[in-house]
UniProtKB/Swiss-Prot annotation:
Transmembrane region(s): 601-621
Species for this entry: Caenorhabditis elegans
Subcellular locations according to the entry: Membrane
Glycosylation sites: N102, N111, N178, N218, N253, N277, N316, N355, N461, N537, N552
Protein name: Uncharacterized protein Y92H12BR.3
Coiled coil: none
Entry membrane topology: Single-pass membrane protein
Main location, first listed in the record: membrane
Extracellular side stretches: 1-600
Amino acid sequence: MKAQLAILSLLVGLLAAQDLRSLLDICANPPKTTPKTLSDKISLPESYKISGSMTDWMKASTSLLVESASKEFRVLEKQTRDQMPEKWIQELTGAKLTSFINVTSGECIGNVSKPDLFKISRFESIIGADTSSLYSIILGLIEFDKSHTGFFVEDHVEVVGGVNAQKWVTCIDGATANDTKVLLEVRYAGEETIRPAQSPFSNPLLLSIRLAELPNFNSTVALNHVSVELDRYELPVGNEAAVVHGVWCKNRNDTVLVLKPLDEYAAILNYFDPSTNRSDVVEVLYSKTKKVIHIAGDSFENGVKLFKATPKRYKNGTDYILHDFNYGYEFTMSHGACQSFSPLDDSSEDVLVKNGTDHFIMNNMEWLLVDPGLRFSLYESDVDMVGTAFKTYRAYDGRDETIVELHVTEDMEVHSMARFRMGSRHLAVSLTVQRIPMESSRLNMKTVQLSNCYDEQKFANNTLMVQIKDKTLSDLSQVGLNGLNEAVASSISKNVHPIIPYRVIVFYVESRDSGLEMIVRVAEKTEKKPGNVVGYNYTTELTTAEIFKLMNDSMTLDKMPIEVLKNNGVKEEWMADASTMKMYPPENDDGFIGYTGGAMFVLAIFCLLIGVSIGAVGVFVATRRQRISTLAYQVFE
């Protein structure tokens, strides 16, 4: 751009020597041809990008201008020799504010006055008082032309920008005899000349405007003399109103954003910290319907940014967290194994205390991604590498003196976000979001997968066996073990007594007559009181023995239907045969640690297959016995 300025300055010097006499002769001796008006076709379309120069002949200075417009913004860029480049961005919708940016320093001030390309009072009656843009100057010229005529310079052909230019001149007297005079010259491409290279531009195409204020039309010494020349017409690229990353404009009408609700949401979040060159990738599954939020990642040793949790909150190796707002508990896991089970508390960003109560409720997912305390203003829209259009908002966070840049889709869903250091404009952290379908998320875990976290390993009399009427393993294959587990837990809560589903674990065996027999384990009620959530009464949980007695009563009366969902979408009701119900292990087995002969035989074969000695089997306690020798007891007892 500096090279362009140097060339332009040379041209200014040459053109400044031009004599106004030939044009003033037209004012003194008007041609005999009929005066004509300019065409209003020289107006600019809604979207455009034009470049050129503005020259003040009396000050011997010139400026390069680039102006662009879209439906949302009009942008003017100006550069003058020995001055830092300047940029004005005017909103064309909403509050219609104007922001000024020092392009070199990056300083931005919102809600400033419009710029003045030149401010000469005598010219206001001709081009209007608004000289903030080339667009407004051209509009003023068209409005002036509605009541004024001029003359085309005959037998005078100029080639400007590769097209034949027509010259139109008008001489303007003052309101009184003592008022100064004004000479107005307009050059434009005639309708018969070569058409512009890009549509929607068409001839006549404005090429230049020149205004000279004179004491009278006999004087060739101007009091004020300015010109504007346009040398390029094109369509905007789309990012002309962009403010460089890390810059926030002061004094704008910042507001709290209304983001798209994310009540059912699954996504992969990638947090990147350039200072450590480290990415923390986490998967999140949020369901307001199910009142749960799951988070999983490689490790949370740097904390959980989504919860604003510090590294000290979770142990090294934690890679899964579940917050269950139905029952008020937090579960954590590491490498697929249970790590902790604890009451839900409000030290995490996703847990809110409902106004006027002490009850815990879920924070909105959109506000976990974007701090609801920040106030944003709109910047220019953009398109990412895959063609997704998004809006850009920015806010200043005084707590850590960072600039937050937020990208959202047209319907205001979070697309990505970045934080920049105030002043240096260095990136502090970035967030990119990749949405995934809820149903395909690997975090769609069943309650049985977390039952080991709840179970406090109190094994006495907490397992029973019962046969399902008229069902076989083939029927189970159409439902799945997890599906059966959920159905049994749901049936107990609906038909027997309300119970937290994490207490229920279901497995199966095949009976002697090839029927389906299920093993139901109901863990003892935990001694850990839950967080204070709405809907779950911890005090009503019964002991396992009490639950089993009620289950037996309900099954005997066929009042405990198990509603399962088959893989073809059809629901069925399964019924347990109460006459086959028995405790597992048998009640007459008190204090016995060992195996029957048949069981030992089966276990010996099992141990040989997996390379474990029979001697090792002898130290198995009752817990292993119920899990490993199920088939042995079923066959040999």
